[in-house]
Amino acid sequence: MGLPALEFSDCCLDSPHFRETLKSHEAELDKTNKFIKELIKDGKSLISALKNLSSAKRKFADSLNEFKFQCIGDAETDDEMCIARSLQEFAAVLRNLEDERSRMIENASEVLITPLEKFRKEQIGAAREAKKKYDKETEKYCGTLEKHLNLSSKKKESQLQEADSQVDLVRQHFYEVSLEYVFKVQEVQERKMFEFVEPLLAFLQGLFTFYHHGYELAKDFGDFKTQLTISIQNTRNRFEGTRSEVESLMKKMKENPLEHKTISPYTMEGYLYVQEKRHFGTSWVKHYCTYQRDSKQITMVPFDQKSGGKGGEDESVTLKSCTRRKTDSIEKRFCFDVEAVDRPGVITMQALSEEDRRLWMEAMDGREPVYNSNRDSQSEGTAQLDSIGFSIIRKCIHAVETRGINEQGLYRIVGVNSRVQKLLSVLMDPKAASETETDICAEWEIKTVTSALKTYLRMLPGPLMMYQFQRSFIKAAKLENQETRVSEIHSLVHRLPEKNRQMLQLLMNHLANVANNHKQNLMTVANLGVVFGPTLLRPQEETVAAIMDIKFQNIVIEILIENHEKIFNTVPDVPLTNAQLHLSRKKSSDSKPPSCSKRPLTLFHAVPSTEKQEQRNSIINSSLESVSSSANSILNSSSSLQPNLNSSDSNLDVVKPSRPSSLPPNPSPTSPLSPSWPMFSAPSSPMPTSSTSSDSSPIRSVAGFVWFSVAAVVLSLAWSSLHAVFSLLVNFVPCHPNLHLLFDRPEEAVREDSSTPFRKAKALYACQAEHDSELSFTAGTVFDNVHPSQEPGWLEGTLNGKTGLIPENYVEFL
């Protein structure tokens, strides 16, 4: 597990969790500094002690082999894994060189010692100086704050205002120092990935020059050296991009910290001074307090930054009432009283300022809670995935592929913003939608056209690959097994809405054509991933963790481009269950990790050879085939009985197999046989046995036979074969446009759902969400704003500020 990311928004809160996270980063820097010192010492010993060359080299190799890199985040890219393993590779090379009894080492001091000393003194030393400054400002701020809060409210207003201004200045300075220190720590942690390894690589290269007997070994080392150099350069390039993004975020936090505050599960949190009664008077103890409006739970953690830790046990109480203290009733300022259900007496608390007290009062006195809004930083504009949107993208793609497919830096070089906006305004004109592709784009530069395409995708109300699936795509990219990555992303793409998937397919086919011409345009698959990753998978909120995930967004786009034919033209296999994924990861981790040069996917690499298409093995037995033939014959006879079907029937949507509405209505919510496939993640409404529409009666008459036959087959199959049943049914859906009637709910239920207002509902059973669009809950949970969803058998409701899908027969309306 890597180091947790340090969020700039936590600098303002200065919470205990933030302090603990900061300590872990400081400990890692101290460990790195200590290791560099030891490495430098061993290197000097290697240069000076030729007689003990063998033992010195083995000690040096052992030191390299024992050190482990710690990267920010919960997963590593292929480049980072390659760099992290490089020290072990170096150790193995040194052991082999020891067998050859090499005796000559020259220029090792300049190549190895000087850069490491420079990194340790300039980078780690700067981080230590920043820590001293940060600790000093922490003590100064806390002392000033305590002194300020001890001022009597009876003093003159001018004196109080002057004191308030002074505290604000000290607080602002402390906040800026905190941000700069966090930024420096993040920078050093990222720099060590390349500034630390590069000198070692150069040192090894120097050794190969003077070792005649190591020539063959150096030749064998060439492939790994090349891959490692690419990985280091890629890491350096990502660092430059990430550093600018983090620096931009830090500046935004300085200008408006509240706007970029991270989403918190608590309605309100922060430091409060709690009055504690003693035998002789009272004392005020600093606590870090959190409050949840839904449960009315107040948690108080005694914590003082100056002492460096907790001062007692945590305490949680249930809020009964909250009342502001009158100014003349207590000497302290900014005070309010809290009554608890499970604790006698009144708890008097002191906020840090008048504004802070107002926020706490608003959160506790029954007013509407203040939540962080997930505002998209991109302008929504009027961009939509409609006919005009598809026309715009097709026109841009046509212009690029006919006039500029070989232009260097395609999609990387941006056009002039004013011309891009002008082109977009022309393309988004409804009149332009009917014109041919070349009529509009022929007069524009290719870089303007490519910038217009990217800008239009960024102007969509949400990213093309949707917020709700973003974490799933990132998790898929973090899987160690390449085949599992592709399989997971394949499954996720087919869970996207139809228009999103069509647009994504159109774009990926085009990007594959661009990558095929990379020798002319210099845009490899990896480079295209860097360009389109943040656009197609832009984060919902701007945080350091989101910036760190950009590298995995790029990997997702690479996989989509390289496997676009398989992903978009074939139906995904049954997704792995959580247990299978865990087993797959365990097997992958237990086996010896492959050499860096043999990994099939890196963040930046040349276009790989064409992958062989995987042949899918059929799992449908003879029973399923008989069901298919019987159902087809009945449907054909039924369609012949309906020559006068409404013309609108042909446009009705075909049911998607991701959520069949024919499953039993009330399975046991804790059934151990319930699979983790999203199709069976929750029950749906039962099948209708009759219909009020005479036009659909012949089709509906087939329902009993088809679903009875399917049910008989399903009961005899293992869960892993269930996907084949619905794949079979989908095969003859296009031939019978009215087949969707088999899956429809009764018209009465539809009318009832559509007329149902937003209401509250209570959960009858517990349910664990299988994907991001669903809600997890326990029995007895109460949902707000419950209303019908577009998914048959599912409702949409809100729980703890999150909106998602709820199984219809798991709840009852209140």
Curated annotation (Swiss-Prot):
GO biological process, one term: signal transduction
Major site of localization recorded for this protein: other
Keywords of the record: Cell junction, Cytoplasm, Cytoskeleton, Endosome, GTPase activation, Membrane, Phosphoprotein, SH3 domain
Changes after translation: Phosphorylated in a PINK1-dependent fashion promoting retrograde mitochondrial trafficking and clustering.
InterPro entries recorded: AH/BAR_dom_sf, BAR_dom, GRAF_BAR, GRAF_fam, GRAF_SH3, PH-like_dom_sf, PH_domain, PH_GRAF
Site keyed Arginine finger: positions: R412
UniProt cross-references to Gene3D superfamilies, sorted A to Z: Arfaptin homology (AH) domain/BAR domain, Pleckstrin-homology domain (PH domain)/Phosphotyrosine-binding domain (PTB), Rho GTPase activation protein, SH3 Domains
Domain of life where this protein originates: Eukaryota
CDD domains per UniProt: BAR-PH_GRAF_family, BAR_GRAF, RhoGAP_Graf, SH3_GRAF
Biased composition (Low complexity): 591-600, 638-661, 673-696
Ranges annotated as biased composition (Pro residues): 662-672
GO CC term, one of those recorded: focal adhesion
GO molecular function, one term: GTPase activator activity
Residues bearing the modification Phosphoserine: S668, S671
Span list, region Disordered: 584-618, 638-696
Domain BAR: 7-262
Presence of keyword Cytoplasm: yes
Compartment(s) of residence: Cell junction, Focal adhesion; Cytoplasm, Cytoskeleton; Endosome membrane
Domain-related comment: The BAR domain is important to associate RAB8A (or RAB8B) and RAB10 to endosomal membrane to promote tubule extension. The BAR domain is also important to recruit WDR44 to endosomal tubules.
Known partners and oligomeric status: Interacts with NYAP1, NYAP2 and MYO16. Interacts with MICAL1 and WDR44. Binds to the C-terminus of PTK2/FAK1.
Function, in words: GTPase-activating protein for RHOA and CDC42. Facilitates mitochondrial quality control by promoting Parkin-mediated recruitment of autophagosomes to damaged mitochondria. Associates with MICAL1 on the endosomal membrane to promote Rab8-Rab10-dependent tubule extension. After dissociation of MICAL1, recruits WDR44 which connects the endoplasmic reticulum (ER) with the endosomal tubule, thereby participating in the export of a subset of neosynthesized proteins.
PANTHER family on file: OLIGOPHRENIN 1, RHO GTPASE-ACTIVATING PROTEIN 26
Descriptive protein name: Rho GTPase-activating protein 26
Lineage: Eukaryota, Metazoa, Chordata, Craniata, Vertebrata
